[in-house]
């Protein structure tokens, strides 16, 4: 199965695909890492991260197609180490893990600021499946921000306005026209849609509709139009 597709803006012949769906329902299908095409999908080359199993998002630098970020969720049914945010600076020839929480929590979403690609937001999800249920939420879930291309990260999970208590799955997006505006769809007892007008420093809940978050393992995506 396919969890993420990213086309390089600077060269649309270059496409990265992350395998394994991040919507880990009962019949989830895992993948075998990241694949790359340099001829618009005619042929493909395997470029690694085979034990990441579920890949939720891939982001490519808008001006340099060799700079790639991968949100790897990891194994569905148990702990493993190949999870978190990975970065390549050579088109997938090698990968470096730049953000990690634990062997039970992985990166499920990534947002890149269209006006400043060195600014990134990463969502982590602490989750695992059992044959009869999904355990969603835990100490590894959270929201993180980097302003230096993923080299360092700040935990913004408990910034003013975001929900307290156990956090589950998170979707994150940045306005393409105003870098200060960020939205997050958060699974939590007091979750919902949250908006920041100051780059994630403070937040306001804009929608508490339970239908948006009650079955987070099926879908937790949010996209900014403006």
Q: Which residues does each predicted region cover?
A:
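Beta-propeller blade termini and top-face loops
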Residues: 1-226
């Amino acid at each position: 199965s396919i969890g993420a597709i990213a086309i390089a803006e600077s060269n649309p012949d270059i496409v990265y695909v992350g395998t394994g769906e991040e919507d880990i329902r009962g019949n989830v299908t895992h993948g075998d890492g990241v694949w790359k095409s340099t001829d618009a999908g005619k042929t493909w080359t395997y470029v690694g991260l085979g034990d990441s199993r579920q890949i939720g998002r891939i982001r490519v630098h808008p001006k340099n197609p060799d700079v790639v970020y991968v949100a790897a969720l990891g194994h569905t049914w148990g702990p493993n180490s190949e999870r978190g945010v990975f970065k390549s600076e050579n088109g997938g020839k090698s990968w470096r893990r730049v953000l990690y929480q634990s062997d039970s929590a992985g990166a499920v979403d990534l947002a890149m600021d269209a006006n400043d690609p060195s600014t990134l937001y990463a969502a982590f999800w602490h989750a695992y499946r059992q044959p009869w249920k999904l355990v969603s939420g835990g100490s590894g879930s959270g929201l993180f921000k980097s302003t230096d291309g993923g080299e360092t990260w700040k935990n913004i999970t408990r910034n003013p306005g975001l929900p307290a208590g156990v956090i589950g799955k998170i979707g994150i997006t940045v306005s393409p026209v105003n870098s200060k505006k960020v939205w997050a769809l958060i699974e939590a007892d007091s979750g919902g849609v949250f908006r920041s007008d100051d780059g994630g420093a403070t937040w306001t809940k804009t929608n508490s509709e339970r239908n948006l978050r009650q079955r987070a393992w099926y879908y937790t995506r949010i996209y900014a139009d403006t």
